[in-house]
Design a protein with these regions (language model features):
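Short pre-catalytic strand/loop immediately N-terminal to key active-site residues, enriched for Gly-Thr
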Residues: 115, 164-170, 223-228
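Small-residue helix-packing motif on alpha-helices
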Residues: 32, 42, 59, 196-204, ...
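Rossmann-like NAD(P)(H) cofactor-binding subdomain of soluble oxidoreductases
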Residues: 33, 39, 48, 56-61, ...
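Internal alpha-helical scaffold of NAD(P)-dependent oxidoreductase catalytic cores
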Residues: 103, 107-113, 129-167, 178-218, ...
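NAD(P)+-binding Rossmann beta1-loop-alpha1 motif at the extreme N-terminus of oxidoreductases
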Residues: 1-54, 58, 62, 127, ...
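NAD(P)-dependent Rossmann-like dehydrogenase/reductase catalytic/cofactor-binding core
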Residues: 2, 205, 209-271
Length: 271
């Protein structure tokens, strides 16, 4: 991986995950600048030898790569002073949810190489899944750098059409919360059966972890086969799945993901 000077605008959880992931891969700390108005966040990075600043314009001006790691609702405000900076020879990466490449180039008109990224919170433990999109103005070299950057905290996947970023949002960006809610419901059910909260959590989290590992380590088996392999006719698993199916579980999941996509599309028009 090339060691370009990268400036992070925003030092929140996702920026922290990426920066610390890069440092674990021996990326030079002095090649990273993090801009954030919060003194405690800056101190967190400074302890690792990372350069910090409160002057976004000065930091961005010297950077080769700029990563926007702020909430979509404040992106326009953050980008306003940055529009005076010449981005023509810089790689611009955005992890702001629902912000299109077209919108980014409208906010920063001189930007040529732009990569839109949809990461997810498992990046905080090095198990992220990030969807990436770049238009034809972004070189192969810039694409490779963006991919290497996000690979520091998990896996990456390029989509050919920006429209597919909405599906990526539903599939990985938001989906950790779906899994958490399912685990939460299972845990509460076990508590209602008399188990302690700790025991209930240990049972459900290990079941989820083991199931995910079975999926990863058996790529030759489709998901329905894995499910069927656990489900004996007339058994306990079948009884549980029958209840889920009676309540149209698959339809509920599809409706939830479609709602996520609809909101993602709506956000493109809001910010």
């Amino acid at each position: 991986m090339q060691h370009k000077l990268v400036c992070f605008i925003g030092g929140g959880n996702m920026a922290q995950a990426i920066v610390f992931g890069l440092l674990k891969q021996a990326y030079p700390a002095d090649k990273i600048i993090v801009c954030d108005p919060n003194e405690e966040k800056r101190a967190l990075f400074a302890q690792k030898g990372v350069r910090t600043s409160t002057d976004n314009v000065a930091a961005v001006s010297q950077a080769e790569v700029v990563l926007l790691a702020v909430k979509p609702q404040v992106l326009a405000e953050v980008c306003s002073p940055l529009s005076a900076v010449d981005f023509s020879d810089k790689l611009l990466i955005s992890i702001a949810a629902g912000i299109s490449v077209k919108r980014l180039t409208a906010l920063l008109p001189t930007a040529k190489a732009v990569v839109r990224v949809m990461p997810n919170t498992p990046a905080l433990v090095g198990e992220g899944m990030a969807g990436l999109f770049a238009d034809q103005n972004t070189s192969e070299n810039d694409r490779t750098f963006a991919q290497d950057l996000l690979s520091a905290v998990g896996k990456t996947l390029w989509v050919a059409s920006e429209e597919h970023m909405h599906a990526v949002t539903a599939a990985s960006g938001s989906s950790p919360a779906y899994f958490f809610q399912f685990l939460e419901a299972m845990q509460q059910s076990l508590i209602d059966m008399g188990l302690s909260a700790n025991n209930a959590r240990e049972l459900v989290q290990q079941a989820m972890l083991g199931s995910a590992k079975m999926v990863v380590e058996n790529p030759q088996l489709d998901l329905s086969t894995l499910r069927q392999n656990v489900t004996s006719k007339g058994g306990t698993t079948a009884a549980a799945l029958n209840v889920l199916n009676q309540h149209q579980f698959n339809d509920i999941v599809q409706q939830a993901m479609q709602a996520c996509v609809a909101r993602s599309k709506e956000m493109e028009t809001l910010f």
